[in-house]
């Protein structure tokens, strides 16, 4: 006998999605996804100056910010056969790469992690063993006993002092949580680190696009002047700062995010 399960709304994408799944003998035989909201952006931009459309379509979302605006200016440029300057293309690529990294880190840690990381279990972890687990995954400088002791204290404080903390309410202790306490502690430490990474990487968009979310774009190029001697333009100080942000983010991705994604997927697959 076929059973249909409906999840409506899917809460972690702002509630604009409905999912249906047909299950027969414990196996999903069919599935359907439905977008349940129209924002009317296409209607809003109708008959407007094509050079201004990027500013409207970008407001469709404040999370996946900038990509809608970028697609808009590229569409206008393609239609008019405009070839933008190489520097403008580089700036756009840097901005989009920054938000892509932020999205991946956010999705993995903030939107997924607590589905399989037990916060309460982490409070019972041995920081020494947690450090050993972390050191087996990468050479990240923070993989120390003292670091995980401090993280454990911070999490306990969150839970004990704020009833509104996201750590204060959950299905903690449910048998579906299978990860060892030490792995949970490592994951929660990286969860908190990911918040700092997100805060830093979006500065690339702010420096080149003026703000985040919804940075500025321009049909035909980018609205940011480059002058190494002007404090109000893209000078060497700002460009070096961007390079530092990129380097720090690369370190986090290579030594934290990627090892976590691979190892936790492996652990879940072998439960």
Where are the regions that the model predicts?
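Active-site bordering "gate/hinge" segments
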Residues: 1-268
